[in-house]
Curated annotation (Swiss-Prot):
Pfam families: CTP_synth_N, GATase
GO CC field: cytosol
Annotated catalytic residues: C378 (nucleophile), H514, E516
Region ranges (Amidoligase domain): 1-265
Binding-site list for Mg(2+): D71, E139
HAMAP family: PyrG (MF_01227)
Domain Glutamine amidotransferase type-1: 290-541
Positions contributing to ATP binding: S14, L15, G16, K17, G18, I19, D71
Protein's name according to its UniProt entry: CTP synthase
Residues binding CTP, per UniProt: S13, D146, I147, E148, K186, T187, K188, P189, T190, Q191, K222
Length: 555
């Protein structure tokens, strides 16, 4: 029997419902329970796949090829369960499915309404996503009081009635602000947020109160009194330097035990030793390395959320504090590569569109010519191919057909056909819809013997997640290989280039897939760990060069 924990948010958005849900999931998993997490998004887009990163942040790709909310990335980084397309759905998807059923005649001519048809569909999707787990944590996007969230809140209210309080539990995440002018912590916003939630029929069982500092006992007692929540169930969650401390903080306040008690679950004590090691390693680095992330969405760091976390994970596993310098590729176009002079390694992430492309190409050229470790992900690999073709293979004006359809050397072109992981041939053509038509999800990759990629992974075949519409043009690969480009990874059917590297460079790697989606704080990822180690080596080599003249004078 699956138990359901519904997590809502109040007062303001961006309080950290996703991190809190994932942290509670980690605690319950450490107590011996099988856990899954769902995210219900109230926007009308079918999925975030075609949304601007500036509006939505990163699109997280699941193993089965769904384009989902970035919170699913948090879920996978905190728990061992793998998310699927069933773990995230939107208002748009719910309405699309209901309308499809109506057109098919499933409702036998009835009038389709929010209640019961939309709410029934929401409940069915929640049950489907939770199937097989001991506990399903269901995060409701948005803020209580938003009109968009009402169908989701109504659906979970109905689930409490249908399943009872031994199988459902409500957690409300709320803000308790500190007003500096008055010198006081204010509980009134939380009181009103709970009042709003109760007005639609939901009484929270547990409150998680976000604040700058830990809540004093007096304020916790006051919140408990005015919200009808027992004082032990008012949890204080103050700001922390690392999100990986949160499972420990919530465990120490007894949240996991409180949940198990309310849901009548017999569970063991939570063993969070792995999380203690992660936090200790992050707090006590022995080295520092500076990485330039050259992109065009750098004004919103959530656009590269999994990427920044993967670099942090690599730092944890190399005892290194990773300083990330986000550099706008258009700034490099304007001011040149001076912006890259002080970094130890360069990373060009994925992206779409022609804006800022030449700046990324300059960054790849700078890394190649100066022996600086380079990691190109998705578009970043394609950028490296374009740069190499132009400046090493004498292919003047080489480009991707995404940016220049009339380029004389289309070294990167539209992927028209590929073999999916299941052995099915997928096909795409110009003019297809943008949404859901890319090469998506986990795809197998075969690594070349004696390549850097093979050494980093320690195996000859890996599965990594993809999200792209363009690929390296096989017709021009031979010319590039003659000039020193190494194709170190290919798709299983040999049709697509998955990884490249340079034989005459200390560490220059490009991958068509997104390794950041499978990095976790407890395991890291071999590509990022190798990249950070290379950055440290480059930093030490630079120090040695700078020290050499003074050494000669001493001699």
């Amino acid at each position: 029997m699956t138990r359901y924990i519904f997590i809502t948010g109040g007062v303001v958005s961006s309080l950290g419902k996703g991190i809190t849900s994932a942290s509670l999931g980690a605690i319950l998993e450490a107590q011996g329970l099988t856990v899954t997490l769902l995210k219900l998004d109230p926007y009308i887009n079918v999925d975030p796949g075609t949304m601007s990163p500036f509006q939505h942040g990163e699109v997280f790709v699941t193993e089965d090829g769904a384009e989902t909310d970035l919170d699913l990335g948090h879920y996978e980084r905190f728990v061992n369960a793998t998310m699927t397309r069933k773990n995230n759905f939107t208002t748009g998807r719910v309405y699309a499915d209901v309308i499809r059923k109506e057109r098919r005649g499933d409702y036998l001519g009835g009038t389709i309404q929010v209640i019961p048809h939309i709410t029934d569909e929401i409940k069915a999707k929640i049950r489907e996503g939770a199937d097989g787990a001991d506990v399903a944590l269901v995060e409701v996007g948005g803020t209580v009081g938003d009109i968009e969230s009402l169908p989701f809140l109504e659906a979970i209210r109905q689930m409490r009635i249908e399943l009872g309080d031994q199988q459902t539990l409500f957690i409300h995440l709320t803000l308790v602000p500190y007003v500096a002018v008055a010198g006081e912590i204010k509980t009134k916003p939380t009181q009103h947020s709970v009042k709003e939630l109760r007005s639609i029929g939901i009484q929270p069982d547990i409150l998680v109160c976000r604040s700058e500092q830990p809540l004093p006992d007096a304020e916790r007692a006051k919140i408990a009194l005015f919200t009808n929540v027992p004082e032990p169930s008012v949890i204080s969650l103050s700001d922390v330097k690392s999100i990986y401390e949160i499972p420990l903080i919530l465990r120490d306040q007894g949240l996991g035990n409180r949940v198990c008690e309310k849901l009548n679950i017999k569970a063991t004590a939570a063993d969070l030793d792995d999380w203690k090691k992660v936090v200790q390693a992050q707090k006590n680095p022995r080295h520092t390395v500076t990485v330039a992330v050259v992109g065009k969405y750098v004004d919103l760091e959530d656009s590269y959320k999994s990427l920044s976390e993967a670099l942090i994970h690599a730092g944890i596993h190399t005892q290194t504090r990773v300083v990330i310098e986000y550099i706008d590729s258009e700034a490099i176009e304007l001011h040149g590569t001076e912006l890259l002079k002080k970094v130890d390694a360069i990373l060009v992430p994925g992206g779409f569109g022609s804006r800022g492309i030449e700046g990324k190409i300059l960054a790849a050229q700078y890394a190649r010519e100066n022996g600086i470790p380079y990691l190109g992900i998705c578009l970043g690999m394609q950028i490296a191919i374009i740069e190499f073709a132009r400046h090493k293979a004498q292919m003047e004006n080489a480009n991707s057909t995404e940016f220049d359809p009339k380029t004389p050397f289309p070294v990167v072109a539209l992927v028209s056909e590929w073999m999916a992981k299941e052995g099915i041939i997928e096909k795409r053509k110009w003019g297809d819809d943008l949404g859901g038509t890319m090469r998506l999800g986990g795809q197998p990759c075969r690594l070349k013997i004696d390549s850097l990629a093979r050494r980093l992974y320690g195996e000859d075949r890996v599965i990594e997640r993809h999200r792209h519409r363009y690929e390296v043009n096989n017709d021009l690969i031979g010319e590039l290989e003659k000039k020193g480009l190494v194709i170190s990874g290919r798709s299983i059917d040999d049709r697509l280039v998955e990884m490249i590297e340079l034989a005459d460079h200390p560490w220059f790697v490009g991958c068509q897939f997104h390794p950041e989606f499978t990095s976790t704080p407890r395991k890291g990822h071999p590509l990022f760990i190798g990249f950070i180690k290379a950055g440290l080596a480059a930093k030490e080599a630079k120090k040695a060069v700078l020290a050499a003249p003074s050494q000669e004078k001493t001699d």
